[in-house]
Amino acid sequence: MKKSQLQKYAKLIARNGVNVQKGQDVRVRACPDQLDFVRMVVEECYKAGAGKVTVEWEYNPVTKATYKYCKLDALSRTEKWEEEKYKHFVETRPARIFIESDDPDALKGVNQEKVAKAQQARAMAFKPYRDQLDNHYQWCIAAVPGVEWAKKVFPGDTKNKAVEKLWQAILFTSRADGENPVEAWNEHNKDIKERCDYLNSLKIKELKYKSSNGTDFRVGLIDGCNFLGGKEDTLEGIEYNPNIPSEEVFTSPMRGNADGKVVATRPLSYRGELIENFSVTFKDGKVVDVSAEKNEDLLRSMISMDEGAAYLGECALVPYDSPIRNSGITFYNTLFDENACCHLALGRGFNECLEGYANLSFDECKEKGINDSLIHVDFMIGSEDKQSFDCHLCPFSP
């Protein structure tokens, strides 16, 4: 892959992704799969005016060894320095960049119950800080190819060829393969905004999904809860793009108002393992049954993370004609696969979808119907059979 094109991708992440402000600190989290690209991102952040850029490294084999050998009480414990780090985030509000390259099977063979308990304890400990940061800083998730991930996507190719093909797929689907990715995203954001404005003008009350694969589902929406997509704004008015790529327009549904069965159309990578060929059944908004051909126990563990994990936090609509769907690739990565087709998310909803949310407390957002949870996990339900997958738009009464 040409370095000049990767430099443009890095610039896209710094400029359109987190939109680094003059003097603002930046935190980058990455795996050591593409070291030179991480350097490019750091460089572009400084060119954009960043104060100080700090990189936090993650290495999947170390993470796996930690979960395998570390005692649960130690895994669950939060250290003083970690709390101080979050306090510092709340005070300074750095932009945050997450560069994904994880192996979809990174934690295969690890005790998932142990992982769940540790993650739940730590998530609860840090939730107050995350709530304080919510919508007060820019963040962006983007991706680079790791060898294990590339081989999962292109199993018939050599390691080098698989990585090269995944690079090409990432840049193509991220609209970063052209001469000016920054301008391409400016135009893309305009298109997404037009779609959001149209959907919001309909005052949609309910979405209905039906497919020949077994999906037969309805979900109620919240009056005054908008569809968003593409670029977002912090409460301070700073624009940023949280996901690169992104094709979706999304909203948060009414907690407790969903019934029926949805059948997933793509695998879900969760906690370093793949959940495959699964379905989820709702009654009165809550998950009452799940089934999966692979890792059903992991799926059940996910919806048991806390009370809100069994309720929906997002309904997203994705156009059938999009770069990711047109690529024909299953990425085994939610950042990409969720933008290939319509999807739902279990767990935490989006307060920012509510009209006037800046003047609402967290409790007031919950009272209006926004779900709260420690998790937010997207899963794909869009069918390629357009004749058998429909979305019925039922407007609120005037």
How would you name each of these model-derived features?
Residues 1-259:
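Active-site bordering "gate/hinge" segments
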Residues 11, 200-202, 271-273, 308, ...:
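Short solvent-exposed loop/turn micro-motifs enriched in small/polar/acidic residues
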Residues 33, 102-104, 146, 214, ...:
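Short, glycine-/Ser/Thr-/acidic-enriched flexible segments
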Residues 98, 142, 210, 220, ...:
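Residues in well-ordered beta-strands of folded domains
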Residues 249-307:
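Long, well-ordered mid-to-C-terminal structural blocks that present hydrophobic/aromatic surfaces
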Residues 257-259, 275-277, 284-287, 310-314, ...:
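Active-site lining segments that contact anionic ligands and/or coordinate catalytic metals
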Residues 289-358:
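Dual-mode signal for accessory low-complexity, basic/Gly-rich regions
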Residues 363-398:
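Extended hydrophobic packing segments that form well-structured cores
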